[in-house]
Regions:
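Short histidine-centered catalytic/ligand-binding loop motif
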Residues: 28-33, 104-105, 115-119, 182-186
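Compact, glycine/acidic-enriched structural inserts
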Residues: 96-155
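Active-site acidic/histidine clusters and adjacent loop/turn architecture
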Residues: 10-11, 15-60
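Long, solvent-exposed, polar/charged low-complexity segments
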Residues: 1-16, 41, 86, 141-216
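Short, flexible loop/turn elements at secondary-structure junctions
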Residues: 62-64, 83, 95, 106, ...
């Protein structure tokens, strides 16, 4: 069955899970998760796979081993298209609506070093600055893990100091749960944003590349 949109029950399910993040709630409402969240997300990513690649759906369970927050379930459903290990495209559904992103969410130490070296050099740093400026101008957010201070060895007046602070970098756009979210128009919205991330992804895969080192 093709993608037809996300039903109201998906948002009701996550609103309830935010209020009661417990095994009892999840077990009692698991049919809503299966039918209104997981199945439509699979249909959505399957419809986009021919153009962007196969997506991995994340499990609904949180890893709480090293977290102070022991809530057992994620309050969103995400899916990721891995273009180069760690660099790719993302789509997420939660009680607040739909979110898409593209970039690198975590980087190993060698990737951070390559990223900063490329940003530092005008020949590669200026194109990234232009990509980021154009994404912001088009209404996308630019996010990622950032240092509060400047990296060691970088002068205070570096023209790309803000980008150099990043340890990860991705662009994103959030959509409120408007009526179109219940229709196949979701495909168009996700496709448009994923195409918009292409220049950033190309820059990252060219200059950062994948890593065999442990991620931070």
């Amino acid at each position: 069955m093709g993608f037809t949109g996300f039903p109201d029950e998906a948002f009701v399910f996550y609103e309830g899970l935010e209020a009661d993040n417990s095994k009892t709630y999840f077990t009692r409402h698991k049919h809503f998760y299966d039918d209104a969240v997981r199945a439509p997300m699979i249909a959505l990513t399957d419809a986009l796979a021919g153009e962007f690649g196969e997506a991995q759906l994340f499990r609904p369970y949180r890893d709480v081993r090293f977290s102070k927050d022991k809530s057992p379930y994620k309050t969103h459903q995400g899916a990721f298209v891995d273009l180069t290990p760690g660099i790719g495209l993302y789509v997420q559904l939660d009680a607040s609506g739909l979110y898409t992103a593209g970039g690198v969410y975590t980087q190993a130490s060698d990737q951070v070093a390559r990223y900063r070296a490329a940003v530092d050099e005008d020949i590669s740093g200026k194109p990234l600055e232009k990509i980021v400026d154009e994404l912001r101008a088009a209404g996308y957010t630019i996010d990622g893990d950032r240092l509060k201070t400047r990296p060691r060895g970088i002068p205070e007046d570096h023209p790309r100091l803000d980008l150099l602070r990043h340890r990860s970098l991705y662009a994103g756009r959030r959509f409120d749960p408007e009526p179109w979210i219940h229709t196949p128009e979701v495909l168009t919205r996700v496709r448009e944003t994923w195409h918009a991330y292409a220049p950033l992804l190309t820059w990252l895969t060219t200059h950062v590349r994948s890593s065999d080192h442990p991620h931070r």
